[in-house]
UniProtKB/Swiss-Prot annotation:
It comes from Arabidopsis thaliana (Mouse-ear cress). The lineage of its organism: Eukaryota, Viridiplantae, Streptophyta, Embryophyta, Tracheophyta. Signal peptide: none annotated. The keyword Cytoplasm applies. It is found in: Cytoplasm. This is Putative cytosolic sulfotransferase 2. The keyword Zinc-finger does not apply.
Length: 67
């Protein structure tokens, strides 16, 4: 099933042209997927950063995805 999903996604326009249908560049559409990397893409205050961190901890509590 995972392989089929990968095959299906590889046919997406953004993967062929390196741009989305709206013309957004590939590098702006895809991220590295590194923990905490969102901080490099958003300009937020320390207060907002703390709220985001707290929300993530709350929503993912018990999921096994947190440290």
């Amino acid at each position: 099933m995972f392989f089929a999903l990968c095959v299906a996604l590889s046919g997406r326009e953004v993967n062929k042209t390196r741009r989305t249908v709206n013309g957004v560049d590939h590098k702006d559409f895809f991220r590295d997927g590194k923990v905490g990397d969102w901080k490099n893409h958003l300009s937020v205050t320390l207060e907002t950063e703390n709220k985001i961190d707290m929300t993530i901890k709350e929503k993912f509590q018990g999921s096994g995805t947190q440290d």
